[in-house]
Amino acid sequence: MIKNLKNVSHILFGRGCFDQLGEILAEKCRGRDSFVLFLVDDVFSQSPLRERLPLKTQDLLLWVNVDDEPKTAYVDELTQRTKDFSGNLPRGVIGIGGGSAMDIAKAVSLMLTNPGSSADYQGWDLVENPAVYHIGIPTIAGTGAEVSRTTVLNGPQKKLGINSNYTVFDQILIDPELTISVAAEQRFYTGMDCYIHCVESLHGTYLNAFAKSYGEKALCLCREVFLDGDPDSNDKMMMASYFGGMSIT
């Protein structure tokens, strides 16, 4: 059976586009007695990015630690902290960081509208209720988490994603400027993550023309970045991450 693919519905790409986040939130998430939840990798807690967050006085900012892979217990903790913050659910959840930070944001947005523990939903299409409107903003390229329909979590018994159409971000902002400060070593490893995703996809059992087209383009971009020293490498690596994520989706 051919599946009906759910994709990110709105994509903003370009250097400096992060500064348009406030406009998007004003349109989608702002209202009387409403707040927005920001889940941001704690590596940015003392960085200039902190001052660029379009926070309002009623919003909740939580710095997330991703030194270890995201755990279901941590997702449940962040979900409860958000519920305790206000009598209402947030109008939006914003995930800013690498793949783990974005996975946490996706998982929390789901658990705010679904009962129980996030461990209950590890598997395929177990989520019953749509997530809170959520936005993903990658600050490093390679994982493809910004476009995937899964959020990979370590549970009490297994490491497995919450795989659901409701997991997919409603909006992503792909701003290559956010990756400029990434250390060369880390940039290489996440870039190779993208490259390996594409190799896996192109040799997969269920390969079709759709996945092949994205995988081949992502591989081409990865090679341009790593072999040619392209001056637009940040832009190309961000797009390789997007295409690679689409290929394995």
Predicted regions and their residues:
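Active-site segments that bind and position negatively charged phosphate/pyrophosphate groups
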Residues: 201-249
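DPxDG-like acidic metal-binding loop motif
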Residues: 103-115
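Short glycine-/acidic-enriched loop or helix-start segments at secondary-structure transitions
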Residues: 47-50, 104-106, 146-147
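Acidic-aromatic/histidine active-site loop/patch
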Residues: 99
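A glycine/threonine-rich phosphate-anchoring loop and its flanking beta-alpha core
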Residues: 9, 113-207
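Catalytic cores of large soluble enzymes that bind and process phosphate-bearing ligands
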Residues: 13-14, 70, 183, 187, ...
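ATP/NTP phosphate-donor binding region
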Residues: 1-92
